[in-house]
């Protein structure tokens, strides 16, 4: 029996084409995703996060009314005025938007940790906001990769944010963070829609 097996192997080795099963036929080359569709998806996520931020800011105002402007020196300044939208270029917009949103993500995480007991009632909404910010950041990273844009250098470690000096300080910080994030996302939607027309 052993000899028969060896004989079969020898015979098969004489005709290698019959011994090796052919592989699957080569398919059509993979089509890279349309960057306009990727940009559409990013705009939808940004609009959704803008609506969430607007709603959470309204809840905060209802629970803790606070007149006037609220600022945090550690927050990024608004990337661009609405009047300067015409001069935008895609690489700069995506890089700046990613950097600003990373800063806001860090501030939302800080607010959840150090905002004080008054803000605990908004914890579920702040958690959802943090998760959606993270999702949008991943989408921006994917979009930059699909467009073959140069990857930004790693961000240097940011200094830790000091805890609010009082419960009221935490509330004012929340107003500043949500207000700034709202303006940034509104600017981002306008800028991304304009840039889509140039792709």
Curated annotation (Swiss-Prot):
It is found in: Secreted. Residues 182-190 are annotated as: Important for interaction with IL11RA and for the stimulation of cell proliferation. Interacts with IL11RA to associate with IL6ST, giving rise to a multimeric signaling complex. GO terms for biological process: B cell differentiation; cell population proliferation; fat cell differentiation; interleukin-11-mediated signaling pathway; megakaryocyte differentiation; negative regulation of hormone secretion; positive regulation of cell population proliferation; positive regulation of MAPK cascade. Its main location: secreted. One of its GO terms (molecular function) is cytokine activity. The record marks 168 as: Important for interaction with IL6ST and for the stimulation of cell proliferation. Disulfide bonds: none annotated. Changing residue 186 to V: Increases affinity for IL11RA and stimulation of cell proliferation. Cytokine that stimulates the proliferation of hematopoietic stem cells and megakaryocyte progenitor cells and induces megakaryocyte maturation resulting in increased platelet production. Also promotes the proliferation of hepatocytes in response to liver damage. Binding to its receptor formed by IL6ST and IL11RA activates a signaling cascade that promotes cell proliferation. Signaling leads to the activation of intracellular protein kinases and the phosphorylation of STAT3. Residues 1-21 form the signal peptide. Coiled coil: none annotated. It comes from the Eukaryota. GO terms for cellular component: cytoplasm; extracellular region; extracellular space. InterPro entries: 4_helix_cytokine-like_core (IPR009079), IL-11 (IPR020438), IL-11_mml (IPR020412). It holds the Pfam family IL11. Belongs to the IL-6 superfamily. This is Interleukin-11. Keywords: Cytokine, Growth factor, Pharmaceutical, Secreted, Signal. Gene3D superfamilies: 1.20.1250.10.
């Amino acid at each position: 029996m052993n000899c028969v097996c060896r004989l079969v192997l020898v015979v098969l080795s004489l005709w290698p084409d019959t011994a090796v099963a052919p592989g699957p036929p080569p398919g059509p080359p993979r089509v890279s995703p349309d960057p306009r569709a990727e940009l559409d998806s990013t705009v939808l996520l940004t609009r959704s996060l803008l609506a969430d931020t607007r709603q959470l800011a309204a809840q905060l105002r209802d629970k803790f009314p606070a007149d006037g402007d609220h600022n945090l020196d550690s927050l990024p300044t608004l990337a661009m005025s609405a009047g300067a939208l015409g001069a935008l270029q895609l690489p700069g917009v995506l890089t700046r938007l990613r950097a600003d949103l990373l800063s806001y993500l860090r501030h939302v995480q800080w607010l959840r940790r150090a905002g004080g007991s008054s803000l605990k009632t908004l914890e579920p909404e702040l958690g959802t906001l943090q998760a959606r910010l993270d999702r949008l950041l991943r989408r921006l990273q994917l979009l930059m990769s699909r467009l073959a844009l140069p990857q930004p250098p790693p961000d240097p470690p940011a200094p830790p944010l000091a805890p609010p000096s009082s419960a009221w300080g935490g509330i004012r910080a929340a107003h500043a963070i949500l207000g700034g994030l709202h303006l940034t996302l509104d600017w981002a939607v306008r800028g991304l829609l304009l840039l889509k027309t140039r792709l």
